[in-house]
Amino acid sequence: MIQKALGKIFGTKNDRIVKAYAKRVAKINALEPTYEKLSDDELKDKFSKLKEQVLAQKLTLDDALYDVFAIVREASKRVLKMRHFDVQLIGGMVLHDGNIAEMKTGEGKTLVATLPVVLNAMNKKGVHVVTVNDYLAKRDAADMGVLYNFLGFSVGVILGGNYDDKARKEAYNCDITYGTNNEFGFDYLRDNMKFRKEDKVQRGHNFVIVDEVDSILIDEARTPLIISGPTNRTLDGYIKANEVAKQMKCGEPADPLDKNSKATGDFTLDEKNRAVMITEAGISKAEKLFGVDNLYSLDNAVLSHYLDQALKANYLFEKDVHYVVKDGQVVIVDEFTGRLSEGRRFSEGLHQALEAKEGVKIQEESQTLADITFQNYFRLYDKLSGMTGTAQTEATEFSQIYKLEVISIPTNLPVKRIDQNDLIYKTEKEKFDAVIAQIKYLHAKGQPVLVGTASIEKSEKLHELLTKEKINHSVLNAKNHEKEAQIIANAGDKGAVTIATNMAGRGVDIKINDEVRALGGLYILGTERHESRRIDNQLRGRSGRQGDPGESRFYLSLEDNLLRIFGSDKIKHIMERLGLKEGESIESRLVTKAVENAQKKVESLHFESRKYILEYDDVANEQRKVIYRYRNELLEADFDLHDKIISNREDYIANVLDRLEIFDGDSKENFDIQKITSIIKSETTEILDENKLSKAEDYKELKEEIIKELRDFYEEKMAPVDNEQRKSIEKMLYLQIVDRDWREHLYQMDILKTGIGLRGYNHRDPLTEYKKESYNLFVELVMRLKSDSIRTLHSIRFKTQEEIEAERRAIAELQAKLQEEEQKKLKMSGADKGGEDLEETKNVPYRAPKKIGRNEPCPCGSGKKYKDCHGKSGPKKGLFANND
């Protein structure tokens, strides 16, 4: 209350910031007459000279801002036929300063971005513009590219599905690159899995503008980007667990206020946290159905995990709400956009459980090869900024997580949209009856209406009801998204009725004509409050763009998920006291406030969830930075790895002696020479001279002798190749080892994270425990990298030239022999057909020779089994092969 009163007297912090920017706008406006007089060539020449000064570091970007913004505005007038408004100049400065510009729908965010994009592209380090989908990336790159090209900048676009490294590298090497958050993030992960530096596509992380920043940095922040590979684990457990889950009954949780109260049924649901709790009765039932004595023994730990996921799949996740079945696959529906998330899968076996539930092919479980959260990816940039129509409700999170300030930019024209109070009904049926009646009324008078739904299921239900009423309408959901932009663009036509899930069509303006303005503009009808106030505000923001009239209202029921799960009993009591009859609703600011409080509860839960994920990922992120830095040093190194190999060899030998409890200061009586040589032989294939080792008098002499012998073995091994080849081999092996050991480390970290929450029951902070144990795992990883590099380098064997030539001859003979046999078969086949021209056999396609079994005799005539002869060397490629 006090803050509000002070705000009215002195203005809010946001007001003061905007006023400060407005003073700078006056300086830009003062330059407009000067640049208006210049010809196109003179304008380009002026800009080129500014760019040269920036590159020569004679001028900072901040110093150049006034002239650059004035030039961009003038260039835009000439090539785009659009002039930046003063408020758009303010938005551009907010973005350049690395903050979030909150601008209402229709205020021209795409045009605003051109100002800081051009300014920050002048230093030739690259600017990335992130959009929510490929359509917007392609559209904005094409539309704004005309302006950028006029000023001498190149523009690239990164699209999903096109993974040609050369094309992507060219796009990243452009001055300005457009793409989606997923594509930028995955390219970063893929770059850190490349084996040649020239194959990397990204060139750094300088400046990024994130369009619809709330959607990307808030809504999608709970879902990390993961590159994974198959694990070859059995999938039968998911099918069995699904059968068991279907036989279990959901009950009610115990009353926390009654000590004697017990949970009923086989399991209970916590819908707020999407969790399942199995009761004692449920455990007994599951053990009987699985045929095991103890569901939670170590031997059955996997079974209990399968059952937990099967229960979630069957009782918490709904088809056409959380996912759809498309072309025999379970595809996730993005809960914030209503779009299908093709290629994305639920983790921890939940996706496999859903596949078992729906009876489609169960895909293999995957193992993480590389991962990163959006929070940590976007924090890689030297400067991060964003723009959206709705960010103030999440200002605290933007500040705490990303160090970004949200600044609301005034609209160019006053907002005329009327936002009505919510109408609340007892049941969903009554609500939908009222919704249909309102749509019929609006449709009859020709006022366009955009109907927002929270799920595909609800949008299809509305579709059926409107079809019965013979009202022409369009439906836009994840099942029907091909014409998304067109459907949304036409939603402002007279008499149009459009049903859309959540914020489908974001980034596409709904324009109306004068006739529709006279009818009251676009009517927004929400059929359910979303868990986030932001999503509701986005829906409302589709109407009333650029000073147009409009109206919005939400229709709710006590059976809606938000009110049922999170709503207080206050709303229910009010409705009961009023004694409402069927079909009657309540409209009250008090009730609307109660609904907003329910939304705040959910937002708080989600914020804590994202914060929790980030706190844990921050631990992994520090380790990721170290490994990726080390890997990049290897990848980009033109130097010899000789010194690193020497150092790693010393550490490896120290580790071997440590494992045998041989320490510095020990006498030679404590040296078990046979064990030392046995371990080193098993790990490196090298056979040490026991006599020489026996002569060592102390730890230092023993260690030096082992180092000398291994070094000599290695030098002898590398003798057949020249220095450049050796460097290339060593680099490749080191990179492979880093990737393999990092992959295993991520798996260990996943296991640690899965069970760490249980530490809380022992009054220990899970996060502290996770930090401590993950550090220990990382120390082990570093040691393993050193040891594995030495083991692998010493295990390689180069083929001699004689061996290579012998193999080539044997393979050539084998192929000739097989082809001769094949020709005989073909001729016999022609003769059997009774006088057919045998010359025709020349045109018969070549057939691959029969595959030789690994245990069959090798066709080369050596007398060995195929696997021990040419079957051993055949599949191996390159200069060397591992001695397995």
Curated annotation (Swiss-Prot):
GO terms for biological process: intracellular protein transmembrane transport; protein import; protein targeting; protein transport by the Sec complex. It is found in: Cell inner membrane; Cytoplasm. May bind 1 zinc ion per subunit. Keywords: ATP-binding, Cell inner membrane, Cell membrane, Cytoplasm, Membrane, Metal-binding, Nucleotide-binding, Protein transport, Translocase, Translocation, Transport, Zinc. One of its GO terms (cellular component) is cell envelope Sec protein transport complex. The keyword Ribosomal protein does not apply. Its cofactor is Zn(2+). GO terms for molecular function: ATP binding; metal ion binding; protein-exporting ATPase activity. CDD domains: DEXDc_SecA, SF2_C_secA. Its main location: membrane. Zn(2+) binds at residues 858, 860, 869-870. It is a peripheral membrane protein. Residues 822-884 are annotated as: Disordered. Its EC number is 7.4.2.8. Monomer and homodimer. Part of the essential Sec protein translocation apparatus which comprises SecA, SecYEG and auxiliary proteins SecDF-YajC and YidC. PANTHER family: CHLOROPLAST PROTEIN-TRANSPORTING ATPASE, SECA INNER MEMBRANE COMPONENT OF SEC PROTEIN SECRETION SYSTEM. Belongs to the SecA family. HAMAP family: SecA. Part of the Sec protein translocase complex. Interacts with the SecYEG preprotein conducting channel. Has a central role in coupling the hydrolysis of ATP to the transfer of proteins into and across the cell membrane, serving as an ATP-driven molecular motor driving the stepwise translocation of polypeptide chains across the membrane. NCBIfam families: PRK09200.1 (NF006630), PRK12904.1 (NF009538), secA (TIGR00963). This is Protein translocase subunit SecA. It comes from Campylobacter hominis (strain ATCC BAA-381 / DSM 21671 / CCUG 45161 / LMG 19568 / NCTC 13146 / CH001A). The gene is secA.
